[in-house]
Regions:
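Carbohydrate transferase catalytic cores enriched for Leloir-type hexosyltransferases
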Residues: 1-358
Length: 358
């Protein structure tokens, strides 16, 4: 089997979707064990090939990239124009898997995609106009043309079936896993005092305002460390000297921060899965998570849950997590081990195989 896999999101610093693509390809290459050919391809920006090579280092795939001026506009145009067929770009294939908002045209073979969430449809106020337009086109194309739709959770799977009208037998759940760097073993960060850690792009959906208010209610010398890229929309006030804004950091730095935290908090109002929850567990830190059902699978029975819109409840959950630290640490480590990228790769291969014989 020859699998063409779109990796154009790896042209940018790795966030949730980029990490999912990187892990999926690692798991797919491991599960394929040399029996299948995997071509990772991307029409990308001038700096994109270097970033993509770095993201896929050590993963057994053939890489094909093309530097393009105005690459974003050209990828959009390619998707909407319906030509040229992807076969003319990457050669013949049995499966084409596109991974984010780009949906390349193809002449034959299995057509597959991954949908991470339907936030732009359910909560347009939490997204930009550009995001709504791009993902709206992708959702419509996936529903109309894809043989396979992979999702990152049962929650997203049900949402895709109910909202987009995609047949259940076309939907396959492939839950993400923490990277190997996220382990309880290794150095822990020190920020000059005990700290609560949150990992999120600064955008309304991540609900940092409620966490900032909860942190203020806790008082004392407890710091709040915020890791994540710049986002958009209304931002919380971060001028408290007890708040440390750390920005976008490497996985190695993030693992050290997880290990050093007294509690990790993920107060998001809506997720596809919520991989930072599992990353924190894998590093042995107790976790407080929003009670929204989209986070049930990442949480399992190994977190303290709280109403994301109630800062008092979040503050109480943080205090409880500190008291129950050892129980949550053990439960979280066990739960995090149930997720592997090898399992994701096996799910992808099984889906491709089933679609090829239909």
């Amino acid at each position: 089997m020859r699998i063409a896999f779109d990796v154009s999101p790896l042209s940018h610093p790795l966030l949730g979707i980029g990490n999912y693509i990187q892990g999926s390809l690692a798991g797919l290459a491991e599960a394929a064990a040399g029996e299948h050919e995997i071509v990772a391809f991307a029409p990308t920006s001038m700096r994109g090939p270097g970033r993509i090579r770095a993201a896929l280092a050590g993963i057994d795939v053939e890489l094909r990239t093309w530097r393009l001026p105005f690459s974003h506009a050209l990828r959009t145009g390619w998707s909407r124009a319906g030509r040229p067929a992807a076969e003319q770009i990457v050669g013949p294939f049995d499966v084409l898997h596109f991974s984010d908002w780009m949906f390349p045209p193809q002449r034959s073979g299995v057509r597959a995609t991954t949908i991470h969430d339907l936030v732009p449809l359910h909560h347009p106020e939490w997204t930009t106009a550009r995001t709504r337009a791009m993902h709206g086109r992708k959702y419509r194309n996936a529903a109309a043309t894809c043989d396979l739709v992979f999702v990152n959770s049962e929650f997203t799977g049900r949402d895709v079936i109910e909202t987009l009208g995609i047949a259940p037998d076309r939907v396959h759940v492939a839950r993400p896993a923490p990277k190997k760097v996220f382990t309880p073993d290794g150095r822990a960060a020190a920020l000059g005092g005990p700290y609560v850690l949150t990992v999120a792009t600064l955008e309304p959906r991540k609900n940092l305002q409620s966490l900032v208010e909860a942190h203020r209610l806790l008082g004392g010398d407890l710091l709040l460390a915020i890791v994540g890229a710049e986002g958009w929309g209304e931002q919380p006030l971060l001028d408290d000297p007890r708040i440390r804004r750390l920005g976008y950091i490497s996985d190695e730095e993030l693992a050290r921060l997880y290990r050093g935290a007294v509690v990790a908090v993920y107060p998001s109002r809506f997720e596809g899965f919520g991989i930072p929850v599992v990353e924190a567990m894998a590093c042995g830190v107790p976790v407080v998570v929003s009670s929204h059902p989209s986070l049930d699978e990442a949480s399992g029975d190994a977190t303290v849950r709280a109403d994301p819109d109630d800062p008092t409840a979040i503050a109480a959950a943080i205090e409880r997590a500190m008291v129950e630290r050892e129980r949550l640490r053990i439960a979280g480590l066990e739960h995090s081990r149930s997720f592997t990228w090898r399992a994701v790769g096996e799910i992808l291969l099984r889906g491709y195989d089933e679609a090829l014989v239909r």
